[in-house]
Amino acid sequence: MTKIAVLGNGRVGGTLSAALTGAGHDVTVADSSPGAAAEAALGAQIVVNATPGASSLERLLALREELDGKILVDVSNATVDGPDGLPAGLLYPGSSLGRHLQDALPGTHVVKTLNTMLFTVMTAPTALAQSPTVFLSGEDAGAKQVVRGLLEDLGWHQDWITDLGGIETAQATEAAVLFVPHVIRSSGFAPFALSISR
């Protein structure tokens, strides 16, 4: 059993916290208030960033001490939203939220994952007709191995998990969010994910 703090209690945070609890982990969910986030992060071994991507960097910078030496699982995409509320552009073009978090929190092991799918697929990958792919981006091999284990706890088969390399590769997976509005307008909010077929 691992002590996990999920920062963000929206649809993504709620979905992940319920599934991780069901997998036997000790999960604390924190809302957007700084005090709750700091308390949850301080007592956790692993912290999941499920806060809105546009404000994640500012929120997590305030937790620098609480996050030091810990694994930060970043599942957010930092976007500029259009009038319909769907992503219309990237907040960090040419970079990524994951890269900015790692640069700002050098004592924290940032691992980017689960950001290339509708939130329902994060914890129910077998619900799709085609096998989905989940990606890992991060500098620390040990941290990525731990996160790989969490993904397996969430129902991801080993051969569905692809390690892309360092945190610089998060730029590619975060850019994939620009597909989302077109997919939703075409097919609605039916569950979907990127998939690498070999």
Where are these regions (language model features)?
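Rossmann-fold dehydrogenase core element
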Residues: 93-114
